[in-house]
Amino acid sequence: MTRSRVGFGKMPAMPPTRAHGKLCYVEIPAVDVARSAAFYRDVFGWGIRQRGDGRTAFDDTVGEVSGAWVTGRPPSPEPGLLLYVMVDSVADTVDAVVAHGGEIVQPIGSDAPEVTARFRDPGGNVIGLYQDPS
């Protein structure tokens, strides 16, 4: 299966990288799967799809990481293992997070000189935002 990579401009469709140690799949706890899927689609542009078993799944914008929302598992409301999503602009993404029902729990500037922020998604999970400084 090939996926197109987007985000830094259109690139030719190519298969995802397969390498030992690569982060490849994420399960995100959710109370309302449809609401969580819409949140990540609208904020980050993730592709949303139905898997063969009927579960709602996602693919990131560059076709390198996929995953699904899971019910019956408590959210991660406090950072333990903390995932960061790379974005073009943390400031713009903070606005999108709030506009789509998320909550900012660590504002921009707390990790200076890194450009980061943390938010709580509709399922109660805390996730980080990261902007490449270059």
PLM features: what roles do these ranges have?
Residues 3-37, 64-65, 81-83, 133-134:
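N-terminal beta-strand motif that seeds the catalytic metal site of vicinal oxygen chelate
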Residues 15-18, 71-75, 99:
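A short alpha-helix capping/helix-coil boundary motif
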Residues 33, 84-126:
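Vicinal oxygen chelate
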Residues 40:
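Catalytic core of tubulin tyrosine ligase-like
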Residues 45-51, 103-108:
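Short secondary-structure junctions
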Residues 46-80, 126-132:
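Conserved short beta-strand elements that form part of the metal-binding/catalytic scaffold
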Residues 99, 131-134:
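A beta-strand edge to alpha-helix "cap/lid" segment located at domain peripheries
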